[in-house]
């Protein structure tokens, strides 16, 4: 099976659509297919830069695209629900059992409240997911109704993820409009996620660094 196959899987796409609708009603930022594609492509890019085989890169793409399907059931423990759903969906394909388990484990371990990197594929997925901080993820609504999650994402005016393979450094560089969100608010929401990225980078034999408005903060 391929990444293209899973992107065209009706059940996967309906789960993503329903999950994003659920999260919208609960007040969460965008978790649409656009987010999942971005996570898949970032995870693949990370592994490619560090010289992993194409087979592993493809598994990371698949896991990245599917990682949020559990939101269709419930936001709480969505990573584990997603893993269970993915396990059944992937049985439809000519995928080896070890590869299926690898994808399921990556999905099941991507949430900072319950998981952590267990192999390079899960590590790349985590970094791809947690570094997707951008203004366009905020749903359209009056700014007066923004909660702290909305403000933090809306305040990010520029985001770049850089990979230095020679020095083995993965760096997230953010520009934050502090008139919208203070640095304290940013770290109140994202510190645990950034620490998860640090653990994921370590799994890849690299160091994770975070820079905000030109200042090194992690």
Predicted regions and their residues:
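Acidic/His-rich, divalent-metal-binding segments that scaffold phosphate/diphosphate chemistry
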Residues: 1-78
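Aromatic/hydrophobic pocket-lining residues that form π-stacking "cages" and hydrophobic walls in ligand
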Residues: 43, 124, 197
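Terminal helices and disordered tails flanking the catalytic cores of nucleotide-processing hydrolases
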Residues: 132-218
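Divalent metal-dependent catalytic cores for phosphoryl transfer on phosphate-bearing substrates
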Residues: 24-25, 49-163
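Non-transmembrane, amphipathic alpha-helical segments
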Residues: 28-31, 116, 189
